[in-house]
């Protein structure tokens, strides 16, 4: 069967609706972000700490942020984080001992997780199941 771009979009939408994307996100967020330490916190916990620390630094630099509209402040902070590809999150965090051990690189972490062969096989399997379900629905409606 030949597939087109519209079929790809439908498959992607179905994959998301079945909750596979959310499961994948939870899987990545719940993994320890620093496997070199015992009892390493989850990636989500580390990310939350980094965001909180970065926002605190930003407010210290520009106290006017706390007096602005909440939505505007959120948008300003988000744009500051996004514009440099989240590099601000990798800067030294309060409590780091300066030894460089706790370098936090969001992009490197996510890419490494997405290149994990086990995870890729799981995604391929889920996509195949979703495709089979999609084809069954398409054949049943014709």
Curated annotation (Swiss-Prot):
Please state where this protein is localized: Nucleus
Keyword Nucleus on this protein? yes
Q: Which Pfam families match?
A: COMPASS-Shg1
Q: Which UniProt keywords apply?
A: Nucleus
- Which coarse location class applies to the principal site listed for this UniProt protein? nucleus
GO BP annotations, alphabetical order: chromatin remodeling; subtelomeric heterochromatin formation
GO CC, one annotated term: Set1C/COMPASS complex
Q: What does this protein do?
A: The COMPASS (Set1C) complex specifically mono-, di- and trimethylates histone H3 to form H3K4me1/2/3, which subsequently plays a role in telomere length maintenance and transcription elongation regulation.
Q: How does it assemble?
A: Component of the Set1C/COMPASS complex which consists of SET1(2), BRE2(2), SPP1(2), SDC1(1), SHG1(1), SWD1(1), SWD2(1), and SWD3(1).
Q: Which family does it belong to?
A: Belongs to the SHG1 family.
- Additional note from the record: Present with 1520 molecules/cell in log phase SD medium.
Q: What is this protein called?
A: COMPASS component SHG1
